[in-house]
Amino acid sequence: MRFLKSFLVFSIVMLLISGCKSAQNSSTKQAITSPDTSLQETASSTAPAANELSPSISPTPRVQKTPSSSPKPKNAKWIYNRKTHVLTIKGTEEMYAEQTEDWIDNERKFDEHNGIQLNFNERKVKEIVVKPGITVINKGAFAAFRNVKKITLPNTIKKINDYAFYNCQSLQELTIPDKVVSVGKECFFYCRQLRSIHIGKNLRTIGNGSFAGCKNLQSIELSSENKYLETKYGGLYQKKQKCLYFQYQHTKTAEIAPDTKCIGTFAFTYNTPLKEVTIPDSVRRIKGGAFCYCRNLECVHLSNHSKLYKIDSPYGEMGMYPDDLWYSGSFLHCKKLKELHLPNSLKAIDWDTFSGCKSLTLYLGSQFTNFRKSQIAGVSAIQVSPHNKKFSSKDGVLYDRHKKTLLNYPEYKTDQTFVVPKSVRHIQESAFRANEHIENVFFPKKLKHIGEGAFNGCKKLKNATIPGKQTKIGRSAFLFCRHVVIHAPKHSEAAKFAKKHDRMFEVFRKK
């Protein structure tokens, strides 16, 4: 009897435990499957018609890690008419981009999870009409709508965020309403068919590179009541800071307003016709990317009376898509730029300012004091003012004042053979880096050290003659120099280096 009672108690306990586990498993399964179910229910109950995209299941951009991190649309409906190819936006407050996590060749693909077809393709849209009530055009809202020719914005719009019309390649004209106070960065980037734009009376600030790549923009019509901006000399200027936002008139010779203090980010970018520009003495700052990709620019005039004190570092990432991230120095890839005389007021420049300027001879002023290899990368020759107390030059090569250290052998210097001056005791790190012309280099006998990466990427280098027995060599000095032969005395430091790092070696014999 006692055994029977114990068995009954044990059975009841096991049944309870089994029930709890089954309940837990069912709830777990429900939790796992509930998103699909709820999505299907949403699709069936609130499925958009053939000409409507429901914001309740709007995808989110890849630039945001998870869908939950994207702000939810507030009372905004996207209605697409297949017959007229007109997309109409209705609602109130902020309007957010209808985007998924998938970006392929700047084309957004809309959500088809669980067999749901959203019946919308931005490539087909030819006109966008935003109805009154919407107050903000949010980040990337119409980015890459490549066939849109016309966009109508209501007077209720107060703000246009970053990349809003990015890469709308067919857009021809646009009016920014009077209530808009700010336009985000790269808002109209690469709208290459944009010919005219009207700016309302309250627009105060325009983000970096908003009009970069708008190579057909011929006119910017500014409201006569706008107190913050002005158009003159073929450019759009910020009044208070006297900054050139964008030079919209693309001519062979550019004229900048004489009272300008700043040349803005991407102000002249992709200005293909530009061959010559004179920078007024009043300009104190040139921002990153200001003249990048001006492929026909040959001459930039800067006088010795210039007040220029800063050429900014590259602007940094450009573009809202992960594949579009790139960097742009102020004169990046100005391949035809022949010479540039930096004024005495300029003490330093930032990295990669002149990258890709294959024809450039760069003249450093008397007050230039700050140097790193990356700052002057991409030029063909460097000349230094004889009054400079820190640097000197010879045959287009940069040295310290007393020519004890070779600092920079220009990337695009075309000589095949180079003899290092006898006074040189040190070769700076990365001094010859990426020069693809040099084949033979002869070092002086009293050279003490060749720095790390000194000849990194010098692919045509064949012979390095090092006559000194005590010349030490950095481990990566000849990185990616696959065909170089080191010529040095037997049992010298250079011979030891060659043996240790498996470099081709020949015993140097004085002729």
Predicted regions and their residues:
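Bacterial signal peptide processing site
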Residues: 21-23
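C-terminal motif of bacterial Sec signal peptides marking the signal peptidase cleavage site
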Residues: 16-19
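Positively charged n-region of N-terminal signal peptides that target proteins for export
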Residues: 1-6
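Consensus positions within tandem repeat domains that build extended binding/scaffold surfaces
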Residues: 138-141, 161-164, 184-187, 208-210, ...
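Ser/Thr-rich, Proline-interspersed low-complexity disordered segments
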Residues: 32-36, 42-48, 52-70
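Structural signature of tandem-repeat unit edges
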Residues: 84-92, 122-136, 146-159, 169-182, ...
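Alpha-helical transmembrane segments
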Residues: 10-14
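Surface-exposed repetitive/solenoidal architectures
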Residues: 67-147, 164-166, 189, 267-269, ...
